[in-house]
Amino acid sequence: MVSHGSSPSLLEALSSDFLACKICLEQLRAPKTLPCLHTYCQDCLAQLADGGRVRCPECRETVPVPPEGVASFKTNFFVNGLLDLVKARACGDLRAGKPACALCPLVGGTSTGGPATARCLDCADDLCQACADGHRCTRQTHTHRVVDLVGYRAGWYDEEARERQAAQCPQHPGEALRFLCQPCSQLLCRECRLDPHLDHPCLPLAEAVRARRPGLEGLLAGVDNNLVELEAARRVEKEALARLREQAARVGTQVEEAAEGVLRALLAQKQEVLGQLRAHVEAAEEAARERLAELEGREQVARAAAAFARRVLSLGREAEILSLEGAIAQRLRQLQGCPWAPGPAPCLLPQLELHPGLLDKNCHLLRLSFEEQQPQKDGGKDGAGTQGGEESQSRREDEPKTERQGGVQPQAGDGAQTPKEEKAQTTREEGAQTLEEDRAQTPHEDGGPQPHRGGRPNKKKKFKGRLKSISREPSPALGPNLDGSGLLPRPIFYCSFPTRMPGDKRSPRITGLCPFGPREILVADEQNRALKRFSLNGDYKGTVPVPEGCSPCSVAALQSAVAFSASARLYLINPNGEVQWRRALSLSQASHAVAALPSGDRVAVSVAGHVEVYNMEGSLATRFIPGGKASRGLRALVFLTTSPQGHFVGSDWQQNSVVICDGLGQVVGEYKGPGLHGCQPGSVSVDKKGYIFLTLREVNKVVILDPKGSLLGDFLTAYHGLEKPRVTTMVDGRYLVVSLSNGTIHIFRVRSPDS
């Protein structure tokens, strides 16, 4: 980049897009300069003129159109001079390959001159060798500079040609501009000087430039000073935004961990209370059964004695009654003396007592506080840290701790720990985790960036300028899954990096991602027609060559080969770019999704609503329609992936659903519920446990589904830095790679609830 104090070279002005119109993207024709100093073609400005005003396409400044039209905008003689130089270098007889002499037709009267070998920089004429030898032999031309034509067209004399080049008057062709009218500030030729400006004070151009250059240079120096201040302010603003995003990511992780800890504690309390309730009911039931057995025995004895006495009194004769009177009376008196109805045992009825804070809407377990961040000094030594270091640590120490009997209590780590190490300790049903166990679950064990003790963390540079948007939407709280068996996987930010490389001519448009080798990803950049390799840490590893003219769309890595779709064709190439085979696909859809099977020896591609599977030799192994023939014409799989369990997962834009099917096309599950927020389902990826990660580009989300296709909740949102996510892939079954529309890639580690 050219610094403010240096002057741009003529070669840069001629070779760059400086002479191209930013509207029609062609070389400028009749260039006109707006007051904002942006130059466009006169015809292009006429098309933009609306209601007597023109809005600059670059700076968006609106300027009024002069009453005479856009032709009255100031003519850019500087650009005209550069254009004349470019046209002069490119002119010539294209059929003969060499330009013709401009003087021979005038001297000899022929229609065409001889081949030109030289050029006069003052006359701007091409000359043959004979005319060039005598060109400087006259009083008017003895100071002219004649140079070799080959060197001139190669650009060797551009600087000298510019010095000798005279600007032409637009009103009088052939006349050079020589004067400046001081009252009118208008450039004049000799003819213009004699007409309306005859009585006006005029200066020669060289003298006028010497008089006015110091004022312009002073204004330029003032603007350069403003630019320095603006750059410094922009740098400070970017650093503040990076610190904000870094702190937001840190606080978001803390919120998720705190919410997860509270949920774990609540679930543990639920199990504990339900266990106490079951034990109480079982003990009460056992005691009640014993009492019931005793009462039933007494009842049977009394009922039998009463029945016997009743039969004797009803059916016995006098002698028989009197003979048994003593025995019956004794037994009945004995039974009457026993406690027939003992008082019931005390029965303690369970009652649930809820903490008042659970029902209090004003009780906030999580609360944010906002503090004005102080400017950060670059030369900080040990203990300086980032904005969110000691200050956020002190805030965490001042926060009230959530306590319960035998439950969870979030703890603050020491000041030297990074946010990823400052995990909120939680307890499972059998007890509390130790700090060492919690540290073992951080991404450091997987090769992530290690924290810098006491100094500025490395990851600030990774955050800086990466995440483009932070939504005001609250961070999603992942709850228990549908069967109630624990929590969902949650994301842990790993790294972020851009995919635009120095050799790219255009901004990347990532249309495909796939894992490639150990801890690498392969990126299909359709805009730059490249398959780029990156490590999980964002290191650029080069490219996999593709056939000339191919724009890779979707990509999948197989055993020692790469499959990708491009322009209704399926290609299989080796890592060196050699084409193994290609297959023509249906033209009925704009793009074809490609996915590798778990075995790595076959590739699946979506074609007009069905799935075709090819082996390494290019033979069609199988073909099926999700849902069978009954679904013919009813499917449109735009995104496709496979699961470690051997299932196919696709985003069906015709049914607006996510469909899961086996290798025979039998539908295992399908989701088309309100969790899609009315969006078309986007890219899909599957982790090692079968969880499905679905991208919803319109709402900046990645949601998670269970292996059967039931929606579980949000996994990533705009809070995590997502801005129009495009495609995703899963690496090693635990790293979710997400590409954004601006070419940036975010990587999140998928942390399972039982880890």
Swiss-Prot record:
One of its GO terms (biological process) is positive regulation of non-canonical NF-kappaB signal transduction. A zinc finger (B box-type) spans 98-149, 164-205. It is found in: Cytoplasm. GO terms for molecular function: RNA binding; ubiquitin protein ligase activity; ubiquitin-protein transferase activity; zinc ion binding. Keywords: Antiviral defense, Coiled coil, Cytoplasm, Immunity, Innate immunity, Metal-binding, Phosphoprotein, Repeat, Transferase, Ubl conjugation, Ubl conjugation pathway, Zinc, Zinc-finger. A zinc finger (RING-type) spans 21-60. SMART domains: BBOX, RING. Residues 392-404, 419-447 have a biased composition (Basic and acidic residues). Induction: Up-regulated by IFN-alpha. InterPro entries: 6-blade_b-propeller_TolB-like (IPR011042), TRIM45/56/19-like (IPR047153), Znf-RING_euk (IPR027370), Znf_B-box (IPR000315), Znf_RING (IPR001841), Znf_RING/FYVE/PHD (IPR013083), Znf_RING_CS (IPR017907). Widely expressed (at protein level). E3 ubiquitin-protein ligase that plays a key role in innate antiviral immunity by mediating ubiquitination of CGAS and STING1. In response to pathogen- and host-derived double-stranded DNA (dsDNA), targets STING1 to 'Lys-63'-linked ubiquitination, thereby promoting its homodimerization, a step required for the production of type I interferon IFN-beta. Also mediate monoubiquitination of CGAS, thereby promoting CGAS oligomerization and subsequent activation. It holds the Pfam family zf-B_box. Residues 216-314 form a coiled coil. It catalyses: S-ubiquitinyl-[E2 ubiquitin-conjugating enzyme]-L-cysteine + [acceptor protein]-L-lysine = [E2 ubiquitin-conjugating enzyme]-L-cysteine + N(6)-ubiquitinyl-[acceptor protein]-L-lysine. CDD domains: Bbox1_TRIM56_C-V, Bbox2_TRIM56_C-V, RING-HC_TRIM56_C-V. Zn(2+) binds at C169, H172, C192, H197. It comes from the Eukaryota. Pathway: Protein modification; protein ubiquitination. The modification Phosphoserine is found at S475. One of its GO terms (cellular component) is nucleoplasm. Residues 371-484 are annotated as: Disordered. Homooligomer. Interacts with STING1. Interacts with TICAM1. It is an enzyme of class 2 (transferase). This is E3 ubiquitin-protein ligase TRIM56.
